A protein has these predicted regions:
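Membrane-proximal alpha-helical signals and transmembrane carboxylates
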Residues: 2-9, 13, 17-211
Length: 211
């Protein structure tokens, strides 16, 4: 019987691995969200889902839909997804500049109330439509990872103030403190940081260009 124990253990590990792979293959892991204003002054939400292919390449799939501040965007776009969308691995949330000027706390409040969302995720403002940024191709890594690395690299160099969801909320609720957010934009198809946005409470009030 002892000689069979190693074989049984190996079989259990193989079976567990197959189950985990099947579960991952049957869900869409959301890694980024973008919010834009339409010409009708409606909010259009975009979710980013990396699709990992068998040849180890990554295709970035986006799904868009009209979003209301008091409704969950993920629940809305679920109707357009082929597999269930899960929120636990979100890295970035991007707000178009026009929307940020109107106020974004209702969207951020929804994120902080979701127990599956970590407070280390990055929030930022975009000069270009967020749907264009999230749909972009930035090399052989996922779009969310590219944006995360872009921000963290510049924060380590101190070209950007350190900020994330946790820092933003602390600044927002602290009396006399103005939150700041990175501003990103596209130039000839390349994504970069263009400046820092200073907010009065949750509304973009002024910007500082990076040189």
């Amino acid at each position: 019987m002892k000689s069979f124990k190693p074989l049984i253990i190996i079989f259990i590990f193989l079976l567990t691995g197959c189950v985990e792979k099947q579960i991952l293959d049957d869900i869409n892991i959301l890694t980024g969200i973008g919010y834009d204003l339409t010409e009708e002054n409606e909010v259009m939400g975009t979710v980013l889902i990396p699709i990992y292919e068998a040849d180890q390449t990554i295709n970035n799939e986006t799904i868009t839909d009209i979003s209301e501040p008091n409704k969950d965007l993920v629940s809305t776009v679920q109707k357009k997804a082929t597999d269930p969308i899960v929120l636990g691995s979100i890295e970035n949330v991007i707000f178009h500049r026009d929307l940020t000027e109107q106020g974004i706390i209702q969207f951020i409040d929804g994120l902080q109330r979701d127990a599956s969302v970590g407070t280390s995720l990055y929030i930022m403002v975009s000069e270009d439509p967020t749907v264009d940024i999230l749909s972009g191709n930035y090399g052989n890594r996922s779009t969310a990872s590219y944006i995360t690395n872009l921000l963290e690299h510049n924060m380590k160099r101190r070209d950007l103030p350190r900020t994330n969801l946790h820092v933003f909320l602390n600044d927002y609720y602290q009396e006399g403190k103005d939150p700041n957010l990175p501003i990103i934009g596209l130039s000839d198809g390349k994504l970069g940081i263009t400046g820092v946005g200073i907010l009065k409470k949750d509304k973009l009030a002024s910007t500082i260009e990076l040189r």
